[in-house]
Amino acid sequence: MAREFSLENTRNIGIMAHIDAGKTTATERILYYTGRIHKIGETHEGASQMDWMEQEQERGITITSAATTAQWKGHRVNIIDTPGHVDFTVEVERSLRVLDGAVAVLDAQSGVEPQTETVWRQATTYGVPRIVFVNKMDKIGADFLYSVGTIHDRLQANAHPIQLPIGAEDEFNGIIDLVEECAYMYGNDLGTDIQRVEIPEEHKELAEEYRGKLIEAVAELDEEMMMKYLEGEEITVEELKAGIRKATTSVEFFPVICGSAFKNKGVQILLDAVIDYLPSPLDVPAIKGIVPDTDEEVERKSSDEEPFAALAFKIMTDPYVGKLTFFRVYSGVLNSGSYVKNSTKGKRERVGRILQMHANSREEISTVYAGDIAAAVGLKDTTTGDTLCDEKSLVILESMEFPEPVISVAIEPKSKADQDKMGTALSKLSEEDPTFRAHTDQETGQTIIAGMGELHLDIIVDRMRREFKVEANVGAPQVAYRETFRAAAKVEGKFARQSGGRGQFGHVWIEFEPNEEGKGFEFENKIVGGVVPREYIPAVGAGLEDALKNGVLAGYPVADIKAALVDGSYHDVDSSEMAFKIAASMALKAAVSKCNPVILEPMMKVEVVIPEEYMGDIMGDVTSRRGRVEGMEARGNAQVVRAMVPLSEMFGYATSLRSNTQGRGTFSMVFDHYEEVPKSVSEEIIKKNKGE
């Protein structure tokens, strides 16, 4: 099957925004106008094409980035709709990594919102060119120029309107095109009746002023255009378009357009802008990778002639075909039924079928080419971030980095039947989502799930119920404490049972002392003269290791201590490995009174980004959570507070930050180190664990 669309005519774009800015609706309209769907689904009615998981339709938010393909004016546009909620940033990270360009959707009333800033930062990290679509122009309080102002103030981005709205709110009925110097008026609500007219008299002055600003901004980035501009020569529409395209694809300039996706206004013009200004796979730098054995850096150009290389960016479990692996082809061609190498894992994989996805319907294709996004069926070992490549020409592409989970809860199946299904469900869900982990707690036997936030884990439990029919009870969030010793001491452990029959006898003297942080447990044998026979010494070490798993104060694992076996005695007949194991654990218990044991807690490095006016409240809040503020800096017109806060005090923080800053603050946290718990808190923990 020959290539249907050339590489120049391919666009891989993402639609990104703050929750509720209307990006799913915008994607819906794109699919409607490009002829992919015949009836438009409304998000608020729960019938949207892109939001196809049940929870998404109920909550009216997008959780997984659905990938879909559309066609417009001889071009193929692959679209990935991303979620806007902060707990799902991993989805946004994944999709940005494989896109060439993006459309940032803003709400015309609010302009740039907190999650917009987070997503914008991620897009800047990956160097993704962007167009800004100011949506909801029909909404009460919509203000286009205010929204453009927020892009400058909150994102420090070089963004300029290439359109102006005609009217706003109920009166929004047209768009002025500053590049082509014309206007588009809308006759009906389906947006199909569009008339291209001259710019209305009353808007001419404003349009001229903004066109002048646009030309000046583009000319600043293009020497040839600058010369013409300074000499007062006329700059043609073609030159201006080429200048905007060049500046946008090099991520130096961001065109701003407007519309109302819900009222079907401005969507076709948005599609035109995607084609005119966002890059094709040929316009972005060639992807870099390394050769597995030599670590030599190589490039893969976007071309069908190059060896095959692709990045798996998402795994999904589909009710009909099983495991789907979404991948972006960077170079070469792939046929269904062929073999590829997963160079990240060093495994050979067979690509059974290749599907082109459209929200939740699919079409089977036999070949994918450079620049395409598709889904493969039949890959067994591939997970998110893995590279798939030609077996004869190995390469590992730069993968994505995912943060460690910060919150965990215990989860229990409601019945025996649920228990059997729960293991399968958890392993499939952790395959799909690299920031979600599940493990069994050795001490309690409970299943613990960990993720990026409270909403994240809610959704996971919800998906277990719906997709895997597993009912489960969820416990309260838990913190992983540790214990350690602060003082050194020599203690005795003696186990003797010698009443009738064969007895048990083990006797040890052990010196305990604190070890450096992060060094774990170290055991040393200092026995001289055979007072404890050599065959029993490993048993002493093993006995201590077992006893350390359930600490001495509150039952948490003991970390970072040294133990040296210095003396002891044995009995020819009654001594055994078991007896020495028990003697060692008795010595550890005896150490409690002498070694000054303490509880350690995980400390999180927290970064809070807030508008300046909330600074006082946030600093007070951090201190009340036993946090230490370690630094502050201005970022644009926002303030960044960096602090070290105990994880146990961070539960519910997202909600409290939201209410303290009217939703304008965002925060991120990562684990940093373990630190001693203050005495008052330590007493509370011990009481709680002893059930007092």
UniProtKB/Swiss-Prot annotation:
Keywords: Cytoplasm, Elongation factor, GTP-binding, Nucleotide-binding, Protein biosynthesis. Gene3D superfamilies: 3.30.230.10, 3.30.70.240, Elongation Factor G (Translational Gtpase), domain 3 (3.30.70.870), P-loop containing nucleotide triphosphate hydrolases (3.40.50.300), Translation factors (2.40.30.10). Residues 8-282 form the tr-type G domain. CDD domains: EF-G (cd01886), EFG_III (cd16262), EFG_mtEFG1_IV (cd01434), EFG_mtEFG_C (cd03713), EFG_mtEFG_II (cd04088). SUPFAM superfamilies: EF-G C-terminal domain-like, P-loop containing nucleoside triphosphate hydrolases, Ribosomal protein S5 domain 2-like, Translation proteins. It is found in: Cytoplasm. The keyword Cytoplasm applies. One of its GO terms (biological process) is ribosome disassembly. GO terms for cellular component: cytoplasm. GTP binds at residues 17-24, 81-85, 135-138. InterPro entries: EFG_II, EFG_III, EFG_III/V, EFG_IV, EFG_V, EFG_V-like, EFTu-like_2, G_TR_CS. GO terms for molecular function: GTP binding; GTPase activity; translation elongation factor activity. It comes from the Bacteria. Catalyzes the GTP-dependent ribosomal translocation step during translation elongation. During this step, the ribosome changes from the pre-translocational (PRE) to the post-translocational (POST) state as the newly formed A-site-bound peptidyl-tRNA and P-site-bound deacylated tRNA move to the P and E sites, respectively. Catalyzes the coordinated movement of the two tRNA molecules, the mRNA and conformational changes in the ribosome. HAMAP family: EF_G_EF_2_B (MF_00054_B). Belongs to the TRAFAC class translation factor GTPase superfamily. Classic translation factor GTPase family. EF-G/EF-2 subfamily. This is Elongation factor G. It comes from Bacillus anthracis (strain CDC 684 / NRRL 3495). The gene is fusA.
